[in-house]
Amino acid sequence: MRVVYLNPLGQMGGAEMSLMDLLVSMRAAEPLWEFSLLLGEDGPLVERAQAAGVQVIVAPFPRALARLGDSGGGPVGALWSCLKASVGTIRYALTLRRVLGELRPDIVHTNGFKMHVLGAWAHPENASVIWHIRDYVSTRPLMKRLLRMHAQRCAAAIGNSNSVASDIQTVCGPQLPALCIYNAIDLERYSPSGEKTDLDSLAGLTPAPHGTVRIGLAATLAHWKGHAVFLRALARLPKDLACRAYVIGGPIYQTENSQRTLDQLRAMADELGIADKVGFTGYVADTAGAMRALDILVHASTQPEPFGRVIAEGMACGCAVICSAAGGAVELIAEGQDALAHPPGDEAALAGRMAELVRDPELRARLGRAGRITAERRFERSRLAEEVIPLYQRLSGHPAAQPEAGLANAIGR
């Protein structure tokens, strides 16, 4: 079988790490299948995919297409962005159609809203398109319209949580089958054992005193990831708590108005009077090492989280995790057993949870142990191929496909 994956970015965000987990899982399960990855930009994902034995093709997006999105500007801004991107988008779609024709895939597996639309338009007639949707569609006016328009050209959609799968059905209707396949992670890499990143050095801070409890927020700089809530919660902590905080991550998006800058966050910390309590590392390639350096990992998203990959990673690394209780994130944890939760955007509640964990090392240790057990049970990487392969076989008419165990059963899970 030939499978072509489409992804807009070459940089390593959470969606790209999840895509890599799928590629590795599929390659291990089906070594004789042909896997290709077409990207809209160059970046670290190229080398990682090639190392996994996947053919990589980089077909750079035109600048206007790369910057097209729902972030900021409202309906008028979105319309203007579409008009600016239209000519380049048509040319790109024609190029994509030619490349896909040469690759002759049985399955076109798309990632990212732009590639969902482009893949639906450009795929060969004998190939089935699967949208792997890792975000809510209903909150994006432009992409919602585009996906609804192209849904009839898509054979199935995968949501990375039940929350996302339900959202897909709401937007695209029952004619587009949508199933939930949770993301997975590399449990050998994301483990309590291994080297710890020197976060103080990366952030330009003097080493923290022995016994300091380290609290971190690891995320892209997207507005909704809750950096402002995290910083305001830190400012509420009692001054006598022996803790230091870290903002781990940097900007990765080209879409206009989609993210904060590190300078903006540093200025906010200064205004809150906590500049000496928090460090900013910028982009960190070894996220597992960064998480192992933390005692407490905070997930502070202010909007419902489609999945919350960082939650699974933190649990796998043995961190005591605090997560924002909305969307797919609440599907990942058992509150009070393997993680703590707080209402999205509630800085006072988040501060209370952080203070509770800073003061209680036994609770931190218990949550860390339980979180690792949950990660091993639910997020092991080989599960991805076990769930995706039957879908591929069903849609491509593969002889190994079992009608009664195919897409219909997957949707019913």
Could you say what each language-model-derived stretch is?
Residues 335-336, 340-348, 356-362:
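Conserved acidic donor-binding segment of nucleotide-sugar-dependent glycosyltransferases
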Residues 349, 356, 363-378, 384-390:
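A short, well-ordered alpha-helix in the C-terminal region of glycosyltransferases
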Residues 88-92, 110-116, 133:
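Short His-centered aromatic/hydrophobic patch
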Residues 30-34, 209-215, 227, 231-279, ...:
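A conserved nucleotide-sugar
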Residues 191-208, 265, 404:
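A short helix/loop element that forms part of the nucleotide-sugar donor recognition site in Leloir-type
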Residues 163, 184:
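Carbohydrate-associated surface elements
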Residues 16-21, 222-236, 263, 348, ...:
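A conserved mid-protein helix/loop that constitutes part of the nucleotide-sugar donor-binding site
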Residues 320-323:
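Short hydrophobic beta-strand element within catalytic cores of glycosyltransferases
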